[in-house]
A protein has these predicted regions:
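Short acidic-glycine-tyrosine-enriched beta hairpin
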Residues: 55-71
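Conserved short histidine dyad/triad with adjacent acidic residue
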Residues: 8-10, 18-37, 70-71
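Short, surface-exposed charged micro-motifs
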Residues: 41, 66, 76
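Ligand-binding loop in jelly-roll beta-barrel domains
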Residues: 71-89
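Short histidine-centered beta-strand/loop micro-motifs
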Residues: 16-17, 32-36, 53, 59-60, ...
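Short, conserved beta-strand element in jelly-roll/cupin
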Residues: 36-51
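N-terminal non-globular leader segments, chiefly Sec-dependent signal peptides
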Residues: 1-5, 9-14
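Short hydrophobic/aromatic-rich beta-strand segments that constitute the beta-sheet cores
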Residues: 34, 51, 85-87
Length: 89
């Protein structure tokens, strides 16, 4: 499993990463499989999801979390509340 979550990073850190200039992705409540072929960093603006990596424990992510998904990660997304996030590959 390679999911790192930083809860409530400070604004200076987000600005230094350029988070607010990254594209935005939105998705309604749903469940679907996903594979990360390369590392992705995202900042959750709103919503909540449970992500279950193949062979690992589930993690909950939500508004205010900075999340890094490792390359070659296979997982199942269960979006509990419609999600909106900035992301960078």
């Amino acid at each position: 499993m390679n999911i790192d979550i930083e809860h409530q990073p400070d604004k200076a850190q987000l600005e230094s990463l350029g988070v607010f200039n990254w594209p935005i992705w939105e998705k309604e409540a749903s469940t679907f499989p996903w594979t990360y072929y390369e590392e992705e960093i995202c900042y959750i603006l709103q919503g909540k999801a449970v992500v279950t990596p193949e062979g690992g424990p589930s993690v909950e992510i939500g508004a205010g979390d900075l999340v890094t998904f490792g390359a070659d990660l296979r997982c199942m997304w269960h979006i509990v509340e419609p999600i909106r996030k900035h992301y960078r590959l």
